[in-house]
Amino acid sequence: MGAQPASGVSRARRLVRLPWLGPVLVAGWRARTAWRHVAHEAHLAWRWWRDSREVTNFTYDLTPRNREQLAAFLVQATGAELSRVEQLMRELEDDAALHAHVLHATLASPDANLSDASPRYARRIGWYVLVRVFRPRLVVETGVDKGLGACVLASALLRNTAEGSPGHYLGIDINPQAGWLLAEPWTRVASVLHGDSLALLGNLACIDFLIHDSHHHPEHEMREYELARPRLSDTALVLSDNAHASDALWRFAKDTKRRYLYFAEQPRDHWYRGAGIGLTLP
């Protein structure tokens, strides 16, 4: 909610000059302004409690305006034309096979009562476009959870492979059940290692795209970047799914003199305020 219009400010100034009653009226006015916002957030939270099954890693769509902002962010990040970026965004959104797989696999999973079946990709649309444009040979994601992001990234890699630019997704997660959404044909280009990211990152070869989405503690996040740093290719991208709450990627970008960009999510019809995409490029 923005600033009060000039007429409202004028009325407030007149009211506040009234002896005794003026400050009380202005305080009530301010409380009403805040309550309008709080009431809307409370309504969204109630609808989520009623309709959603999720307890963490919330999924949602972006607002139409925020989706356009994501497209603008991707133009800046990739150097691609806006028309190409928008085409790639629609490519993922219109992927009927992926949509059906996520829906049916979620309904059939042991976590069906803790997950919303209908896929909502939000910022992961950006991940997809980055893979389609930059065509990395090795994508590494620390932190897989059920594997929605893994499926999105694998879908991009499958298309790249069909176009003559093969690549592979490697997920790392300490939970042995992580990645249960991955199945054929996505497993043709994707696999998951179960273990501690800090123990496994040092064993990898050349990384073209690193995504931090594991333990969201800034020092753990920075440790992952430090371990991956000597293994990054000259053109590697490094993305943080926690940049809305941590400055670790920004500190890494400054230390390595890499370009840093950030996109902030605005979820549509959800009480959660959203995460974002923190991205560093050479």
Indicate where each model-derived feature is located.
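Generic alpha-helical secondary structure signal
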Residues: 10, 68, 83-90, 96, ...
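S-adenosylmethionine/decaboxylated-SAM
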Residues: 11, 113-118, 124-282
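Short amphipathic alpha-helical segments, especially helix-boundary/capping motifs
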Residues: 45-48, 60-64, 100-105, 113, ...
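Membrane-proximal basic amphipathic "stem/tether" segments
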Residues: 2-79
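Intrinsic low-complexity/disordered segments
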Residues: 1-2, 209
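Residues that form generic nucleotide/phosphate-binding pockets
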Residues: 15, 73-77, 88-91, 101, ...
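Class I SAM-dependent transferase core
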Residues: 80-120, 132
